[in-house]
Amino acid sequence: MVSLLKKLIGSRNDRLLKQYRKLVTQINNLEPQIAALSDEALQAKTQEFRDRHAKGTSLDDLLPEAFAVVREAGKRVFGMRHFDAQLLGGIALHNGKIAEMRTGEGKTLMATLPVYLNAIAAKGVHVVTVNDYLARRDADWMGRLYRFLGMSTGVVVPQQPNEEKIAAYRADITYGTNNEFGFDYLRDNMEYRVEDRRQRGLAYAIVDEVDSILIDEARTPLIISGQAEDHTELYVRMNAVPPLLKRMAGEPKPHEPEPEGDYWVDEKSQQVHLSESGHESAEKILTRLGILPEGESLYDPRHIALMHHMMVALRAHTLFFLDQQYVIQDGEVVIVDEFTGRLMAGRRWSDGLHQAVEAKEGVKIQHENQTLASITFQNYFRMYEKLSGMTGTADTEAYEFQEIYSLETVIIPTNKPMQRKDQNDQVFRTSQEKYNAILNDIRDCHERGQPVLVGTTSIENSELLSGLLKKAKLPHEVLNAKQHAREAEIVAEAGKPGHITIATNMAGRGTDIVLGGSVEKQIDLIRADENLSEAEKTARIERVRQEWKPLNEQVKAAGGLRIIGTERHESRRIDNQLRGRAGRQGDPGSSRFYLSLEDPLMRIFAGDRVRAIMERLKLPEGEPIEAGMVTRSIETAQRKVEGRNFDIRKQLLEYDDVANDQRKVLYAQRNDVLEAKTIGASVENLRDAAVTELFRGFVPAESVEEQWDIAGLQQALASDWQLQLPLAEMVEAEPKLTDEELLERVLQAARDTYRSKSELVGEESWGQFERSIMLQSIDTHWREHLSALDYLRQGIHLRGYAQKNPKQEYKREAFELFSGMLDRIRDDVVRVLMTVRVQSTEQVAQAEAEAAQSHVQNVQFHHSDYDEALASEAAEAQEPVRNVLPKVGRNDACPCGSGKKYKQCHGKLT
């Protein structure tokens, strides 16, 4: 019935494309008129559009003309004309949707259409890329078109001086990575001066490779952290425990005897669980090693941290392996991203896991970190007024984009029909049989002059395959995290005749593989040669292109690019991304995945079913199954994994939404403090509320004198706020004194004491001091609150055993924690301001600078691929920033990481 309706009225995608094609017709009709304009007249269109928009013309109404102008500018600047398919994609992006376009269809050029149109509003457009190389490349490349049309571009990258970053955000169009945009948002909410903030609002963002950023990286929050308590010795001692515990043969099953052993590993959830006997064994081992005192239990409240450290050590030994999840580089454990295979310099696992892995590998253990600020990509990108994205593979995750981000996916038809042939998977019994078949396929392609791209899921597998190819004397390139610096160069050469390239997952994404090899690098070198005249440059470029044509034809005749997958990823989308490297813009190509029953995905999710099929068919050794049924069975397993991962992300989001609501409230209050001309009235309200609450603790409202604890109140006022008041004498001297009158006298005494301090140092200096103390208190208590929320979340699932809804309990308790935090901020601010002894303006300035410095000590930034570029640019980026504050000179860089001199940043707070 549903398919019949689709035939009659078309799918939602068909109906959207039908609407968009009407706009494409309008744009095409404008082409001759726009083409007739001179360069000056074309450039003047930008100001004309801005004037019309300021007078009320909507961006939707400007779209046909603006897109026609960009298309014409593209022809004049690049010699490239936007295809109709790119216009369709541009319209989808402007309408806040995800445009799915095949690899090689020109997503980068397509983005110029909605970017230009939305930049007319002068609110700033953010173009989000997956790495710094692509951000710089696209800003430089597309910037030529924007500058031709009179628009400014900027790019934000790690370790950029603050002045440059602010200028980049003030540009009409800003390029950068998802990490940098997110971190800058967090940094802006940690600043002590309005003028140091970078971003000017979140109006419109286009996210390139949107599936990678909004789905693959959505489980990892962005975290700015500082050093916490040192547990180095405990990690080293706890590292001796896992080898002494015995792993069980399998997971215990209900109503069956528990297998012998101390623990089992759940590979699906990436967790380790102790058995009943395992708990006893662990206590004995910890006691024997002197970690747990004799006769005491691991479950005593004071030993709960030991349990956590032991489980982390177990996970490090059983679930995290060298050259799979991490590598050792320069004596440090560096994480390998599971989706891209890239090294994540600067990123560290949390909850002590990174330290446990360091202890396992015998490298220097670095300090644990305390979270200073944190946000997930889901919550960061949902703050944009309008969000859109582009990718080659979004359709498999369309439901999640709609559910989480309210983003609809529009599949854009290819400019030319796709010719790639996707062959059925071949499944072997063992890895050895699988690799033999892969070698035979690669050898055949190499001999026929067909380029091959082999996709692996880990560095270990890529190096294993590389070793096999070396033995077979087959020349090849390896593209994994260890060769990241040469990534673009290796990818550019991957299309040459007979070339063999091994790539870890989707390393090299964003650079096209051109059949016959890329000539762009040679052309760029010719263009940059100042010794050549324009005529000589043109002649040489033409010669290079002519030499490339026979190579291109040779590769096409051999069948185009051959894609070989050595394993299925747990996400169909990652497999599709690998396949999508072949068959660009109507080129020929083919793909095949080789699998074995020993592959992790097959072993965990689909192995039993496929093994049963192989046994029934009685296939000889080395003979694979190759059938659509098997491929479908594997895809069913992948759907299960995708569904589970979606549930995990959705559940994480539901919990993070609680923290996000609190973050919005706190950051809004912090910004009010930062932006207000004076916060004296706010401080007065806080002080009066704090005094009243303290007073009512000793003198209840509407109570009689016999219920009053005047001695206790007098002592509390003196110790908490240094208010020396003869309250007992007042009450004795005035028998008719009411509690309200007494409260008013206490409030007035507090006001008088406070005013005297303000008058002593001057209103302006005191106002700055108030602001600094308020900001410091907010930041300190927010850090503690984030840690409290983490602990709450880790144990909240246990409420399910008490027949309570863990999510509801988390919301309720998180709200109580937040309310308590706001009260502590108030009390802290009032206590400091009431008890501080001031004698001069200089002392206030010194206290204020110290407050700011304590806030910015030992700052680090964490996320999956943050600081990739820094791994090659600056080795110190991998080390925590350890500033010894008294040594910061006035002309040194400020410890806050802003890039400014100390005297121009936190050294200048007064």
Curated annotation (Swiss-Prot):
The cofactor remark states: May bind 1 zinc ion per subunit.
Q: What is the lineage of its organism?
A: Bacteria, Pseudomonadati, Pseudomonadota, Betaproteobacteria, Burkholderiales
Question: What main location does UniProt list?
Answer: membrane
Oligomeric form and interacting partners: Monomer and homodimer. Part of the essential Sec protein translocation apparatus which comprises SecA, SecYEG and auxiliary proteins SecDF-YajC and YidC.
Task: Name the chain's protein.
Answer: Protein translocase subunit SecA 1
- EC no.? 7.4.2.8
Q: Which organism is it from?
A: Bordetella avium (strain 197N)
**GO molecular function list:** ATP binding; metal ion binding; protein-exporting ATPase activity
Tell me the protein family, please. Belongs to the SecA family.
What subcellular compartments does it reside in?
Cell inner membrane; Cytoplasm
Q: Which residues form a coiled coil?
A: none
- Give the reactions, separated by semicolons, that this protein catalyses: ATP + H2O + cellular proteinSide 1 = ADP + phosphate + cellular proteinSide 2
User: Where on this chain does Zn(2+) bind?
Assistant: 894, 896, 905-906
